[in-house]
Amino acid sequence: MPAPNVAAPFVIAEIGCNHGGDLDLAKRMILSAARFCEVDAVKFQKRDPATLLTPEQYNAPHPEPRHAFGASYGEHREFLEFDIDQHGELARYAAECGVVYSTSVWDMPSAKAVVGLAPPFVKIPSATNQHTELLELLCAEFGGIIHLSLGMTTRAEEERIVALFRDRGRLSDLVLYACTSGYPVPFEDICLMEVRRLREAYGEDVHAVGFSGHHLGIAADVAALALGAQYVERHFTLDRTSKGTDHAASLEPDGMRKLARDLRNVAKALTYKPVEVLPIEQAQRDKLKWRA
């Protein structure tokens, strides 16, 4: 049986909002992810809180006050936002560090702004993967690869997404992510076999299948690779005890570095023997093998 061609996975450190609205901290995180962790890409998030939130949601208190960066939830979200010029600065800094910049886009104003930056890829989060106008905009105006998470998404919704991309001639530019939307996700809810299901259902048509994890540790990510994930995304922080709701389900630099290392090593190991007795085995065979 021929050896499968298992490419090294593309590893994404999701900085998201773990920078706490601090541009200098965001740059330190990029540097750590690129030089120490040796990931392939760093990813942020771009939102327009006034567009995403109703007045009631905007003016409500943060549901977890100890993690709030503002008097209301809307002010909290505004505090964590970088404007598009700052995103451009982060993209340039990432390039200097030798790592790809990307961001999730949550709404129309954010998507229109990020399209102008022309990153290699953008991400549609699970929360907005049914925002048809947003998907249409990216299909029409964004020339790069479009990543999309399928957390909290029904099969019917998933099929509508795939049909839209197929109808717009962009299915080959789509990366579908198996994902469970929870922070953190217990192991029994990770549902890794979704990676295999997506590969079997769409693997011949989409650009790739990925895995976006919000669990603890790195074992599940390596298993996702073995099941066919070509992109692996994990939240990244410099300190899991920092203020903010995403830090607890994030990897610190040591963990992200080990994840990138283990994924690349396991990718090398995912093969059949190309010959019945490997060269590395021959000396031991000559010395130890029982001869009938």
Residues of each region from the PLM?
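Catalytic cores and adjacent flexible loops of soluble metabolic enzymes
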Residues: 1-292
